[in-house]
């Protein structure tokens, strides 16, 4: 199993862009791995857990071919874990040569945000399918 951590920070990222504490200042100076984006992980190049606002940057930074990711597990709907509007770039007209659909797994609210809340009824055109996960 291949696990690639894309981000390990909390909702504000690290360093917090508004914070002047010593830890955040030191992180800015050190750069590199000391700059942490919001939480997400890729498993076996096919599964992504969560889609934060940093998803575009994470994919470009780490040279991730997001067209190969065909499963997206949404853990919850906090803004630092789900930026559903960015998924529009995977639909026809934006993404070309994508062969597999993106299967989205999550609770009712997560799926609603992906399906209706952000896309306003736009057809996914075989690009995105969703599946409800029953919670315990």
Q: What residue ranges belong to the model's regions?
A:
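Binuclear metal-dependent hydrolase catalytic cores
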Residues: 1-136
């Amino acid at each position: 199993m291949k696990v690639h951590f894309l981000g390990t920070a909390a909702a504000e990222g690290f360093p917090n862009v508004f914070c002047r504490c010593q830890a955040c200042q030191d992180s800015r100076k050190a750069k590199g791995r000391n700059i942490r984006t919001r939480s997400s992980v890729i498993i076996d190049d096919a599964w992504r857990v969560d889609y934060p606002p940093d998803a575009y940057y994470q994919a470009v930074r780490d040279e991730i071919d997001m067209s190969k990711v065909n499963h997206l597990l949404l853990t919850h709907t906090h803004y630092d874990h789900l930026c559903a509007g960015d998924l529009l770039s995977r639909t026809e007209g934006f993404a070309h040569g994508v062969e597999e659909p993106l299967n989205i797994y999550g609770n009712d609210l997560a799926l609603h945000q992906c399906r209706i809340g952000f896309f306003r009824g736009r057809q996914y055109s075989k690009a995105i399918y969703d599946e409800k996960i029953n919670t315990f």
